[in-house]
UniProtKB/Swiss-Prot annotation:
Location of region: Disordered: 1-22
Annotated GO MF terms: structural constituent of ribosome
Key words of the record: Ribonucleoprotein, Ribosomal protein
Gene Ontology CC annotations of this record: cytosolic large ribosomal subunit
HAMAP family: Ribosomal_bL27
Gene: rpmA
Domain of life from the UniProt record: Bacteria
Keyword match Mitochondrion: no
PROSITE patterns: RIBOSOMAL_L27
Species in which this protein is naturally found: Shewanella baltica (strain OS155 / ATCC BAA-1091)
Family: Belongs to the bacterial ribosomal protein bL27 family.
Name of the featured protein: Large ribosomal subunit protein bL27
Pfam families: Ribosomal_L27
Keyword Ribosomal protein found: yes
Amino acid sequence: MAHKKAGGSTRNGRDSESKRLGVKRFGGESVLAGNIIVRQRGTKFHAGVNVGIGRDHTLFALTDGKVKFEVKGANNRKFISIEA
């Protein structure tokens, strides 16, 4: 005979899988063409010289070189470029 009242069930216990966003190659690091520099949602960082942008706003290197972060424009936008 049970001496404990039955416990109810919970409706919690779920979470989405992390998307691993963020900067993958930092300023001054060497990259090869095709290397992913940043994975992001929206354009937190904008594509500069020798940097391409994927349809999910991923920034990637178009040429070999070094990563350079810079802030430009009236809106202080962050740009990422590749210096050959």
